[in-house]
Amino acid sequence: LKHRKLGKMEKGTMEVMYMGEKKGIGLVLAGGGGKGAYQVGVLKVLQEQGLLQDVSVISGASIGAVNAMLYSMDNMDRMYQAWDEIDMDTVFDVDLNMLAENRMYFSRNEMLAMFEKYIDMEKIKADSRDIYVSISRLNETQQPEQVEYRRLEDYDADTIRKILLASTALPVMYEAVEIDGKKYRDGGLLDNEPIQPLYDLGIRQFIVIGMRAGKVLNTDKWPDAQFITIYPSHDLGDLIDGTLNFTGRAKEFRQMLGEKDALRSLKTKFQPDDLYIRMEPVLAQNDYNDIVMQMRVNHTYKTMENRLNSNIEKFN
């Protein structure tokens, strides 16, 4: 194992072990709808600390697949901008033509427009980092029966879009997506943390960013692999107030929590200190309280700014 200095994190510097062997590091991004904003905050910190520069392959399920593609554009600012634009209207887009045809699903038109704006399909195909996306193949009764892992670089732009739509096709909300004569839905239904396809490639070092608060990854299937796992320190919500919640405040909270959790996780992993580890739950709660307070301040400031601008307009 090599060693590398990281930049300053809160207090002092951290000397960390760098997990870069020949095949590099596998980055695994779980699915979870609106909870995916959490991964944006985590990725920001991991990139700033140099832990992603040796990632050679990325896998994602559902919104994790979207984040994998956004991250591969190598522009964190643009990734944040994309998430600013993914809102309730994007997710719950109603197409009157679909309703007229008795297709009782939300449209994917707004999501496709976001893909076109922020994801360069040619760059995906040219990128040295492979991207694998999990999709769930349906049987004749339209139930998920088999997970498939698609390497995006093997397909043309149109098929890549279909794979991405399939991996994010939540049941009830969206139509199943047909690819090569077969129907597919959300990849998270059968494998929400697609580690296996990367392991099968020979990857033995992983960074996994999940969505389930407090989860401990069971690594028994991969006994010879090393893992850095980052999961939310606080619950990100259930189906309604979590997965389907793309409101601005929810996204802001999750991004900030992702940043805080990543910083603490790295300190625990690479600068082990018994006292810090024992205090970690308390520090996590303090970080949560800080986020809530900061969001209140931001909301109050924005409200005052809007009122001031409104009053100024009355005099103009």
Task: Show where each model-derived region lies.
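Patatin-like phospholipase
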Residues: 3-59, 69-316
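Gly/Ala-rich beta-loop-alpha elbow adjacent to hydrolase catalytic centers
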Residues: 60, 64
